[in-house]
A protein has these predicted regions:
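P-loop NTPase Walker
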Residues: 1-104, 109
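DNA-processing P-loop NTPase/helicase core
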Residues: 29, 96-134
Length: 134
């Protein structure tokens, strides 16, 4: 299995995948294999005894998070690692600690479009012209 993780990687990528002391910075252009390095590193860590639930991988988009999850799954199967976006991590932390924050467990987070919808509904309920506040 270990050989499969390092197959098709260049020397610098292998070095990043196997890195084990302190932070590792990978600077490279688009399409150069950064996601491949990261997902292979996650698999490498798991193969070397790191508990999957101790691994956290964060990205900016849902598309990138799904791609990373799929790649890790293809390398080592289903894992308990958190692989998601900054927003989904924040939501997970809030949900797991909602009692400390005096929030109900079924709270919702709304975006700017939802806020406008709520404001328009309130204005309508108050018999105010919503166009005046648009």
């Amino acid at each position: 299995m270990m050989e499969d993780l390092l197959k098709n990687l260049n020397d610098e990528q292998i070095e990043a995948v196997k890195h084990n002391e302190g932070p590792c910075l990978v600077l490279a252009g688009a399409g150069s294999g950064k996601t491949k390095v990261l997902t292979n590193r996650i698999a490498y860590l798991i193969e070397n005894g790191v508990r999957d639930y101790n691994i956290l991988a964060i990205t900016f988009t849902n598309k990138a998070a799904k791609e990373m999850r799929d790649r890790v799954y293809n390398l080592v199967g289903d894992v308990a690692s958190f692989i998601g976006t900054f927003h989904s991590l924040g939501l997970r932390i809030i949900r797991e600690n909602c009692g400390y924050l005096n929030l109900p467990s079924n709270f919702s987070i709304i975006d700017s479009d939802d806020v406008l919808t709520v404001i328009k509904k309130i204005l309508k309920d108050m018999n105010l012209d919503t166009k005046q506040y648009s």
